[in-house]
């Protein structure tokens, strides 16, 4: 869970001899001290390599998530023959409103994206992104190539590009993220 990993990240951050890499330092230390479960990823047909991404850095984590929104991702979450099971809260389906608005800037849609249950895209635009459960994208906002965790709220006229937004964050109206390196 998040808290468990966070505590181990903090512990690792204080170690002088650590490279601060998940695969090299953090996961092995967790395995030594805790009961851990794993799933062996194997190529079903035996024709090639199994899917694997080292997500030990933010850039690698971002890239692995962006792989999932491809038309034919290497790790296909929709492959019935190789289901990936996860806990999912019982929430209403995602909702897209104001897509037929007379105002062309008020779109209410998501393209090439994964939108989780409980999300509402209310007059905003989402492109090539992943929206975690109960995210809310308000009117005239634009989210592109980004990962938004649970319960993120994006205010009206906000713009987000190539960002990872932690759960529960509220992006104020008119905020711009990912467009100006100095401001970010």
Task: Show the residue positions of the predicted features.
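Left-handed beta-helix
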Residues: 3, 10-184
């Amino acid at each position: 869970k998040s808290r468990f990993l966070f505590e181990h990240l903090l512990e690792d951050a204080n170690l002088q001899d650590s490279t601060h890499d998940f695969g090299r330092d953090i996961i092995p230390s967790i395995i030594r001290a805790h009961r851990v479960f794993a799933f062996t990823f194997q190529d079903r047909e035996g024709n090639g390599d199994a899917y694997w991404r080292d997500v030990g850095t933010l850039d690698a984590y971002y890239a692995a998530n962006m792989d999932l929104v491809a038309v034919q991702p290497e790790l296909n979450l929709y492959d019935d023959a190789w289901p990936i099971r996860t806990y999912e809260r019982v929430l209403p389906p995602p909702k897209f409103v104001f897509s037929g608005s007379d105002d062309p800037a008020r779109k209410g849609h998501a393209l090439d994206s994964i939108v989780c249950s409980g999300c509402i895209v209310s007059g905003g635009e989402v492109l090539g992104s992943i929206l975690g459960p109960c995210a809310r994208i308000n009117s005239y906002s634009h989210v592109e190539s980004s990962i938004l965790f649970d319960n993120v709220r994006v205010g009206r006229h906000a713009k987000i590009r190539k960002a990872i937004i932690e759960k529960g964050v509220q992006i104020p109206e008119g905020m711009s993220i990912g467009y100006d390196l100095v401001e970010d």
